[in-house]
Amino acid sequence: MKRRQFIKRSSAATVPVLLGGVQVSAINHSFFNILNSESDRVLVLIQLDGGNDGLNMLIPKDQYSNLMKARPNIIIPENSILDLTDTLGLHPVMQDLKTVFDDGKLNIIQSVSYPNQNRSHFRSTDIWNTASSATENLTTGWLGRYLETLYPDYPTAYPNAAFPDPFAITIGTAVSPTCEGTTANYSTALVNPDNISALAVPINGDLPDSCFGEQIDFLAQSIIQTNAYNDSIQTANNKGNNISTKYADDNELANKLKIVAKLIAGGLQTKIYIVRLGGFDNHAEQVEANDTSTGKHAELLNELSTAICAF
C-alpha cells in the first residue's frame, strides 16, 4: 500500500494540506545545486532555538548610538566588539567565528525577515520552518516542498540503487519540520550513529484485509525503510574520520557537527543536515548586570562559534 493512499484513508489526515508559501522558482536555483547527486556540496542548517538576539551577536556598529538608546541594559560595550567591517562586528566571545570570516570562509546575509513580524516563539518557528508569510499557516516545510518536486513518490520504493542514503538527516530525536512534505518527512532522525539498533518489523503471519491491516503494513514498510537507511548510515560512520581536533566534548553543538563531519567523510550521499542548538530564550539571564558581554547568551554564542570553527 502506498503511503499517499494510507494518508488519505487515515483519520489523522482529515485536514487538507496546502502547498502554498514561497515558490520554489523564487529561490535561487544555484542554492539547490547541492542536491545534485554528482555534487559533493552539502547543506548544514544550524537552528538556534528560542529566539537568538541577533543585534547582540552581529552588531551594526554604525547604529551603536541608536542601540544604546533602545537597549542600554543589554548592549555590548563598544570597545569589546570584534570588528568584521567598518560597520559590522561580532559579539566578543565569537573570536573563532571571526577567524573563519578573516579566512574568507564566512559570508553574512543581513535583513532576512518578513513583513508584520510575529512576536511568538512558536509561530515564528513555524514561519521559519515553512517559509510562509505571517498571514498563512502551512503544514509543509520549505525544504520538504522542494524535495517533493524532485521525488514526488517518496517514500515508496526508497531507498533504492539510485538513492541509497537519506535525502536529509536531523541530528536529534525528531525529524525537522523544515523537511516536511505533503505525505512524508524527507528527513531521518539520528541521535548517535555509534549506537543504532535495527527495529523489529511488526508482522507475524498474514495481515487482515482491513484498514488495521493496511496501517500495520504501512508501519512495517516504514520500519524496513528506516532499517535500510540505518545500515547506510552505519557504513558511512564506520568509514568516516574527523581531521579536526577542535571538537570539544562539553560542546553540544560541536558533538552534533562532529557526527555530520564523520558521515560526510565516510561517503554518505545525504545532501542536507539539520542540527539545533537550544536555550536562546534567555530573558533576564541573557547578560550579567556588571558585564553585558557575559551571561547565558554569551555562553551560547561561544558554543556556536567554536563548534562552527571546528567543523
Q: Residue locations for each model-derived region?
A:
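Feature for exported/extracytoplasmic and membrane-associated proteins, marking the mature portion
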Residues: 2-306, 310
